[in-house]
Amino acid sequence: MPKVTNLNHRLRNIMKSKKTLLAIIIAVAVVAIAAVLLIIKPWGGNDDNSSSSAPDSSSVADSSTPDSSSATDVSSSEPEEPAKPLTPVDYYGEMKVVDGKIVGSKTNELVRVTGMSFFWSNWSQKYYTKDYVDYMVDDYGCEVVRCSYGVMDDGVPYDTSCEPLIEDVIEQAIERGVYVIIDWHSHGAHNNPDEAVRYFGELAQKYGQYDNVIFEVYNEPTQVLWKTVKEYAEIVIAEIRKYSDNLIIVGSPQWSQKVMNAATNPIEDENVAYTLHFYAGTHGKWLRDEADKAMDQGIAIFITEWGSVNADGNGAIAKQSTEEWFQWMDEKGISCCNWAINDKEEGSSIFVKDSNNELTETGIYIKELIKQRTDNAPWKKAS
């Protein structure tokens, strides 16, 4: 029966093939089901019988809510950054004139900050850098720096290429949390208010929202009537006020010494102070008396420039007179900036000519004075 035998043999082979195919199909199905189960519920999930080695429930996301607990766990495992120390601007905030005093908007306390003034920008560009801001803050202890944008007597800047450098100083002062005065450093600014309007308008738009920034619209008027200075200042102030309510400082006639002129006819703006300039080798009690009378009339004073030598920038350090001025400023709570960050061969420069930041006798003395004042500042005690 060969044909029957062959038929049986073929049937057995077909049955084996079907069984093999069925086994393969079953195996594939099992693998697929297992994969689906793993996707739906990761291995070792939230079963009541999970072992102690399973992940904590707080680290497993709930499908119905954001995984906030997981984010917390991750952040808590990272080392915490040390708290940043307070800076003068952190502590005081924006400077405001209230009842003839300059106070901090955050503390409502009298603000008394001390620092340095840069020299004329057109003659000292090498110092208008972020590194020198850091040097003044870290080495001298400055709470404020002053940018002196050099402007000719016709009211036109000597060199507009200085403007980006001044902005570098402004931005680094903001970064370091100290105040920065933007000074229109001229003896004849009233002759061309348009240039000042352009410049202060641009910077007020760019930096006027920062508490650090103070605008000084006229450094030192000389032999000019206060009426003329006031008219110029009002034009520039109106432009600044389009963008910023920050403190504005205005100079007065005779190299910013006739503050009584301003006191008897002040500018109508809620946040304006007036600058008084002194040089200890030349100016004494008579100028302090003038300032006292002006403050009694209700105006605020900020000494944006002072020197320990003669008014021409030369001469020896007048230590006794300087100490008398500082005692008076401490009693009145007046802020000040020393002249000047420069290496010109004159008594007021803090650096030796063409040196690598070697301090002059003046530089050493001024550094000690500033640090004595700022080391005991309220913002440091609050840190």
Model-flagged regions — what are they?
Residues 90-96, 120, 125, 141, ...:
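Extracellular glycoside hydrolase catalytic/binding regions
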